[in-house]
């Protein structure tokens, strides 16, 4: 909406250094009450609503992460850069076909460990069992547009293999946003047709907004990954219970 109201042209956009508190969320080594991320949104042309454009944007973001990891390794040799040179793109539907007996979380782990860095495409579209790889709102990313080989979605997550935690780590969620056609389709799929009467939705449906792409990059998660930390509380100040602190201390981890 802001891109429309401030007349942003294709190729231009906005970003925010977002800080938020989520006191009702569960906390663990990669989730805290305090949330910090770079949220960004860019106006694009209608002809940019393609899988190739999405991949190009993902590659640019990943390249910035890779360069940062390399430079840190040059300055501090103990911070080994083990990110692969290129990110691997995988459709959530292809991932299900490759690992049909695993749940989505385990599929992510298996693929992230195999490739080092992956972008899972089409998160939100129902897989063969009728359930999506992960939940997505119907009025945000376009996860339903068919792209190739019968697969769907113009969105996804950047996920890396974290050697310190021996686990996968999501660093960014992003995608090409819904246009009018995708919005109507996804609201119907989710049984949320009544949202068409909301202010934002009405404006999109009547063509007030430019086509856009956007996402969020987790600041603390990226920092803990680049600095080889095992807990998000090692790179940001947040609120932790004494039980959480004691558990971390027992593993040689001291929370800020």
Where are these regions (language model features)?
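Alpha-helical scaffold segments that mediate packing/assembly in large oligomeric complexes
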Residues: 66-104
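Short, flexible, solvent-exposed loop/turn segments with mixed acidic/basic and small polar residues
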Residues: 28-33, 107-109
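Class II aminoacyl-tRNA synthetase-like tRNA-binding/catalytic domains
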Residues: 1-31, 39-43
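Short, solvent-exposed loop/turn segments at secondary-structure junctions
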Residues: 22-23, 47, 125-126
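A translation/RNA-centric and nucleic-acid-associated enzymatic feature enriched
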Residues: 92-256
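Inter-helical turn/loop segments and adjacent helix faces that build the functional surface
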Residues: 44-52
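Extracellular structured ligand-interaction cores
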Residues: 12-14, 35-39, 115-117, 157
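Long, well-ordered alpha-helical scaffolding segments within enzyme catalytic domains
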Residues: 52-69
